[in-house]
């Protein structure tokens, strides 16, 4: 299956990238999914200029993207601290404070700076297919073409603000080989949609230290050959291609999977 189809699929609900006219994008959305509002997660996508006045991912949100762990850690009563190792924080130094860049850094070489062009035109990692998306209509068309159906759904996280300590309450598998769409941390509204071979997506119910209940989209990669080897070893003391590695997905991203139930198009 072509990744282009996956890409737009994922980005369809999530990456209604406001580079084209907002009204036409929303009209097209409604023509396919009547009475289905765009999720709050995608509020920036309603900006006609396709550009925000500040970076979309704030400093306090970066830990949502920098917590690596093993698949066997996904079980009830497991404790997690977001951004749980000093080594991870030092390895992904371009993303430890809010600056332009890409938050999903486990697939990147370690660089102090990265432009939008650097990322979007860089080679893909092993087992990865990626695409930067800037047109809502083309995304929708490709998603529907890929699945052959409009029955798809986007799943995202809703981490509690200013909370970084959580206990797992429940784990639910939602699908294999999902397409992930990440908002890139640039003022220009662009999403990176990528698929990595041999992945499993979960929704993990969490309870924060203050009692707030939340859900975290989680992805486990069974093929890790394309990951950043330095980060992977420093965080978990494992080498590429040896064991499955998992990570949470922050609030400014979503996974697209087929919708086999009567659920709403976009959830969480």
UniProtKB/Swiss-Prot annotation:
Q: Which residues form the BURP domain?
A: 68-259
**Matches recorded under InterPro entries:** BURP, BURP_dom
Domain of life from the UniProt record = Eukaryota
Q: Which UniProt keywords apply?
A: Signal
Leader sequence segment: 1-22
Name the UniProt record assigns to this protein = Unknown seed protein 30.1
């Amino acid at each position: 299956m072509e990744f282009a189809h996956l890409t737009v699929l994922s980005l369809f609900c999530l990456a209604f990238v406001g580079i084209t006219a907002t009204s036409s994008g929303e009209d097209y959305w409604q023509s396919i999914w009547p009475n289905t509002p765009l999720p709050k997660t995608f509020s920036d996508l309603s900006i006609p200029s396709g550009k925000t006045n500040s970076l979309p991912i704030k400093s306090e949100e970066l830990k949502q993207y920098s917590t690596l762990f093993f698949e066997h850690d996904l079980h009830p009563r497991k404790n997690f601290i977001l951004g749980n190792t000093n080594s991870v924080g030092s390895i992904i130094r371009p993303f430890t404070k809010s600056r332009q860049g890409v938050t999903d850094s486990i697939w990147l070489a370690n660089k102090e700076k990265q432009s939008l062009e650097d990322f979007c035109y860089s080679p893909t990692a092993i087992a990865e297919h990626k695409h930067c998306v800037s047109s809502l209509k083309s995304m929708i068309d490709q998603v529907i073409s890929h699945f052959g159906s409009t029955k798809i759904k986007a799943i995202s996280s809703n981490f509690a603000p200013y909370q970084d300590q959580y206990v797992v309450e429940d784990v639910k598998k939602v699908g294999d080989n999902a397409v992930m769409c990440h908002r890139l941390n640039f003022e220009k509204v662009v999403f990176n949609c990528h698929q990595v071979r041999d992945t499993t997506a979960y929704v993990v119910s969490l309870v924060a230290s203050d009692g707030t209940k939340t859900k975290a989209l989680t992805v486990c990669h069974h093929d890790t050959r394309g990951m950043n080897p330095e980060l992977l070893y420093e965080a978990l003391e494992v080498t590429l291609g040896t064991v499955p590695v998992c990570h949470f997905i922050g609030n400014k991203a979503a996974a697209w999977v087929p919708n086999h139930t009567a659920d709403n198009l976009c959830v969480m």
